[in-house]
Amino acid sequence: MLQLLSGNPRTVDALGFLLAFALTALMDSVFHDKLPHDHGRAFAVNGELSKGKARGSGLIFVLCIALVTLAVVPFKAEYVIYTVLLIASMLSGYFDDAAETAWNEYKKGLIDLVIAVVAGVTYLNFNGTEVNFLSWSFSLPYAVYLILIIVLIWASINVVNCTDGVDGLSASVAVVTIGTYLLAYKTELAEYGTAGVVFMGALLAYLWSNAKPSSLLMGDAGSRAMGFFIAMLSLKCGHPFAFLLAAIVFIVDGSLGILKISLKRFLHISILKLSLIHISEPTRRSY
């Protein structure tokens, strides 16, 4: 482990960032033609332009992140569990990306719920129920905090997933969001801050191929994993309410997107056709 080779956390962070960037860039190049291809989104902004592009790069950069963090983050049971859940959230999106018929929202929502419950129980088992809000610190009843954690993780996965759809948008906002946590809570995050640096390195490598005009898309495999990771940063920094500010772009854009699609599908009402904010469909309609 690189932690054993250097006592300087900044050196470890730098090495982790460079490894994640280089490995992701290399794997994107090697496996680009082996990924499933996008068929466009029914209600996404310029969704037809995505047709034919390689989709599911999230599979590549999430696995690269997992491998690099094994080298730079101390081996602890809690982090290993979160890494398994990160991969699970990625796989749920990747299998949907690769499916001939898109998974319905209820199926993916149930998978997200299971992941959120396991992550919530794990977090409370290792960290307790203390919460920080501004300058105050207090404890919540176990059941109450567990419910709030489940809501946070489930919502984060879905609003981030909904924001994906425009070249470079979702990954760029994720880099800014993760960077915000690192600037504000690097000490509190400890090794999770290092994981955040690794995540940013992988995303920046992905953006090399995703910046407009893109040739590669992360798909649900990437966006769902990003949502899970951002939620875990919110919890591990000890300030879960910081999510409301750090992820404000995801919250606004994703929530409006979910509202738009819900009204379109269930009430046949079309709104927000033109907006200064990107509003995308959270899932594919049909292939």
Predicted regions, residues:
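Short alpha-helical segments used as structural interaction elements across diverse proteins
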Residues: 52, 105, 257, 281-282
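"…together with the soluble PPM/PP2C metallo-phosphatase catalytic core" -> "…together
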Residues: 2-252
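Single conserved hydrophobic/aromatic residue that forms the stacking wall/gate
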Residues: 277-278, 282-287
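Active-site-proximal helix/loop capping residues that flank conserved catalytic or ligand/cofactor
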Residues: 33, 202, 257, 277-278
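Charged/polar, solvent-exposed surface patches and flexible loops
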Residues: 33, 37, 261, 281
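Membrane-proximal soluble regions of multi-pass membrane proteins
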Residues: 250, 254-277
